[in-house]
A protein has these predicted regions:
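Active-site beta->alpha loop and helix N-cap motifs at the rims of alpha/beta catalytic domains
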Residues: 2-110, 114, 148-151
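Flexible domain-boundary/linker segments
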Residues: 41, 50, 128, 210-211
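Catalytic alpha/beta core domains of metabolic enzymes, predominantly
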Residues: 102, 109, 116-209, 215-236
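C-terminal extensions of enzymes
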Residues: 240-241
Length: 241
């Protein structure tokens, strides 16, 4: 992506490549950032707090979500307080359950009630959304992240689930809570997310790189595809006749 586009929805960058995060921030291409342990591992991050410190020094004024890494709620709470202290623009990512399937609702209620900005992650079902909506403070900024892309990979249409989530947030009401479309798989998800009522869509760098293709004529894409396949055939030296 070479310039920021007004797509009617906030665009967040999802990843943990510090140089890429700095680049898209400096070029004004996104509205915020999300990270997770997978991206940290992929980027070879060995010191989480040092990484976060470097990110926040470079990006002081856009929302950034950092995830807790423990699995028991006592440790999650301790980590959440530490992560929250890293900066005013930090949202603490807390999974909707731990790895045993135990609900994080009580902890979410406690921390949100204290004014801690949270990003509730790994949400897949309307029941999970309903639980989270019921415990978030209406006074505290928060994000509800529905993993629409991964829902789609199970053969389930994510759009009705995301629409229900948007309705629940509106009717609670939670004026400072934003709905985020997570695990983005393709550029078209932007328009699906907007249609469903999402405030934010987060996407990895490979999807961000494709945003300049929005609006390209399909005839042009068709011709480019033919040229690409022809070039592949020529370079491979294939012969039929």
């Amino acid at each position: 992506m070479t310039k920021k586009r007004d797509l009617g929805i906030k665009i967040f960058a999802d990843g943990a490549d510090l140089e890429e995060m700095k680049r898209v921030y400096e070029e004004g291409l996104v509205d915020g950032f999300t990270t997770n342990p997978y991206f940290l591992m992929l980027a070879g991050v060995s010191d989480y707090e040092k990484f976060a410190s470097d990110v926040l020094a470079a990006i002081p004024d856009l929302p950034i979500s950092f995830e807790v890494i423990s699995d028991d709620f006592e440790s999650i709470e301790k980590e959440a307080r530490i992560v929250s202290s890293w900066g005013d623009n930090v949202y603490v990512k807390i999974p909707v359950t731990n790895s045993k399937g135990e609900s994080s609702a009580d902890l979410i209620r406690k921390l949100s009630g204290e004014g801690m900005k949270l990003n509730i992650t790994a949400i897949y079902t309307p029941a999970q959304v309903r639980t989270v909506v019921g415990v978030l403070s209406p006074e505290t900024p928060s994000v509800i992240s529905v993993f629409a892309g991964r829902i789609g990979e199970t053969g389930v249409d994510p759009m009705p689930i995301v629409r229900q989530a948007a309705e629940m947030i509106r009717h609670q009401p939670l004026p400072h809570t934003e709905l985020l479309w997570a695990s983005t798989r393709e550029v078209y998800n932007i328009f699906q997310a907007r249609e469903c009522g999402c405030h934010i869509i987060t996407m990895a760098q490979d999807i961000l790189n494709k945003l300049d293709s929005i609006g390209t004529s399909l005839e042009r894409v068709s011709m480019d595809t033919v040229k690409y396949f022809y070039d592949c055939a020529v370079r491979s030296g294939f012969k039929i006749i």
